[in-house]
Amino acid sequence: MDIMTTSKTDTLLDLSLACWDYDRAQAVLDGTIAVPGCRIAAEVHPTSTLFPLAVGEARFDVTEMSMSSYILQVAKGEGAYVAIPVFLSRAFRHNGFVVRADAGIENPKDLEGKRVGVPEYQMTAALWMRGILADEYGVDTDTFQWRTGALEEGTRKDRLTLDLPPHMSVTPIEAGESLQDLLLAGELDAVFAPKPLNALVAGDPRVRRLFPDFAAVERAYHAKTGFFPIMHAIGVRKTIAEANPWLPKALFDAFTQSRDRAMAKLESIWRGSANRLTLPFFHAEMEETRALMGPDFWTYGFAANRAELDAMCRWSQAQHLAPRRVAPEDLFHESMIA
């Protein structure tokens, strides 16, 4: 493609942008907040369809992307994008450990040697879940008999080629199978679920969470580590960022303003006399979150998140994804390292 270049005083730089429809991205997506010097053509895509496009064909100039996939690409010197520290998706993951009720798994160490399903071995949720098991509970996740594939329906496979050591057992499930079905049939002992498993929501007695009081465990994890698990960042096409070095900061500022608008709206609802959200205990949740994490609980920027990013880079190498230990500074455009 031709390298697009302009200055902020010249004609506008046309950019395609894609991400999921987060409240914190809405003002950029709908044009309420402009990116100075740019004309944005925004598209909304679920990450299940967007991430293969980002990795496979780099379709968009600016895109939401998986942090685990990105770390792996940086370690290999691959990929079309350079990141800015806009973390559109963050999620605590203790809630996603789902086990068979009869598998004899009462604590994390009991997972060793078990048959464990995960949609993709390299996905960011799995990176975090393995990292938590290793750091907090001393679990050797290399002993797991990993099965990969669709969580509940459809098909899924790792979007990146992995070079795993021979002692690792990572096997795709068959076409037409799902991890949930295998768990319910007793062919898996546990599943790492990046979303609430349908069988769990339905109250199927064959499955349960490893951490029944997961909210308390997740709050304790944050209190101990300071981490609010980063899932996704924003990537800018390298050729465009190189030709327009002002652009990463302009995008960062726009997404930060968009997040601030979303946070202000949440606060106005919290402080209002009528609850505008269809969520009965929103006020309690908001107060608990602020008490634990402070008023700026969805942080962007490099410095405030460096320790967390360093843990992710360490885990990526330890889990046989990245061939080398990546420094967090190497993940982001140079204008973002502050």
Name every feature range the model reports, one short phrase each:
Residues 42-53, 106, 144-181, 286, ...:
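Short helix-initiation/N-cap motifs at beta->coil->alpha
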Residues 235, 241-318:
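Secondary-structure end/capping motifs
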Residues 17, 90-106, 229-242:
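Hydrophobic/proline-rich hinge and linker segments of small-molecule sensing/allosteric domains
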